[in-house]
């Protein structure tokens, strides 16, 4: 069975990566799809986010990274994905995600939503939090893969040393 994990991934975090790795053990294929949202100004370009995701998932043969625009449920149907994966960090995530799941079900009864609880070490983690920490010079190496930490330091014009040391 094929699953779709959509998101902005701006940037990809260890929370995202944990969910991708666990999903890859449950499904034959996991499509990690970066949403091209014309109404948002991401910190990283679509190409940068695709490269970040491809790099950190290259060791997972059943993971495919791509992008899409439009309704997630329509893209899931185009990709023959029967499941949309969503990570839940807290109860507050559940209410919003449940509304989306019900909306998707009303648009297509052929695609289910599967909620996966975020692993405890990543339960506080969001891309917004990571960018805020990085913006003010905080260490994000425990929050994102090393290549993404380097990208964040470059984004915020901070010194980048070889080997990830600051």
UniProtKB/Swiss-Prot annotation:
GO-annotated cellular components: cytoplasm
The protein's annotated pathway: Cofactor biosynthesis; coenzyme A biosynthesis; CoA from (R)-pantothenate: step 4/5
Annotated site (Transition state stabilizer): 16
Amino acids binding substrate: 8, 40, 72, 86
EC top class named in words: transferase
Keyword Coiled coil annotated: no
Main location: cytoplasm
Residues that, per the record, bind ATP: 8-9, 16, 87-89, 97, 122-128
Single annotated GO MF: pantetheine-phosphate adenylyltransferase activity
Cofactors required: Mg(2+)
Reaction(s) catalysed by this chain's protein: (R)-4'-phosphopantetheine + ATP + H(+) = 3'-dephospho-CoA + diphosphate
Keywords: ATP-binding, Coenzyme A biosynthesis, Cytoplasm, Magnesium, Nucleotide-binding, Nucleotidyltransferase, Transferase
EC number(s) from the headed UniProt entry: 2.7.7.3
Any one GO biological process: coenzyme A biosynthetic process
Residue stretches spanning the membrane: none
Protein localization: Cytoplasm
Highest rank taxon of the organism: Bacteria
Entry-linked InterPro entries: Cyt_trans-like (IPR004821), PPAT (IPR001980), Rossmann-like_a/b/a_fold (IPR014729)
Subunit description: Homohexamer.
Protein's job: Reversibly transfers an adenylyl group from ATP to 4'-phosphopantetheine, yielding dephospho-CoA (dPCoA) and pyrophosphate.
Family to which the UniProt record says this protein belongs: Belongs to the bacterial CoaD family.
Protein name: Phosphopantetheine adenylyltransferase
Organism phylogeny: Bacteria, Bacillati, Cyanobacteriota, Cyanophyceae, Synechococcales
Gene (UniProt): coaD
